[in-house]
Amino acid sequence: PALAWRAPALGDGRVFDRQQPNTLGDLIVDLLLDASASQNRRQEQLATQGYILAEALTRCAIPVRVLSYCSVSGCTVLREYRDYRENQGNNRIFEFAAAGWNRDGLALREVDWLLRRSGEQQRLLLILTDANPNDDTRLPGTGNQFFSRDYSGRPAVADAAEEATMLRRHGNPPLCLFSGREGDLSSARTIYGRDVVRLPSVGWFAQTVGKIIQGRLQALES
């Protein structure tokens, strides 16, 4: 160490340097929360868990963006509570409020557009959802399907699965944090494939995500 200064100052070949990648700085986390009316009874708990997670990532210098989605009056609204470098914005997560419907396919398409704009490489996309897409605006008829269909059940799940596939193709595979009923677990797997983590309850949200991020960081270091 006493000779370390000689390498850059004098070009001393006896001393070499090696850049150690900052794996914490390489990882970026996107968190997307289902804010439809189905989350009404646990919205305070969701907000608290989201805040705990964002605060922990902020202290670890891991950039995180927190978003939510719901559909109101035929429009799918994507709300941003804090951006990657907005370290003072965690308190806004407590503004999380559940209302309206959830058109999951359109929400995933919007997120795909946002992620492709930013162009980050080491990204972890986490989606907290009950995997029960449902909207009052019908699916339009396309191709061999001449008539419009309700946005619910199999057609809605298929629509969301198609958009999840596009996210994977664009290099941003979504990881589903499933918080729904037993009967909707198969829908979660249809949409997200093997990338489904079932939460025993919303109270396990921050702890579960912490373990996922720890595993991703270990993978980056290896």
Regions found by a protein language model. Give the residues of each.
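Acidic, glycine-rich A-domain
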Residues: P1-S222
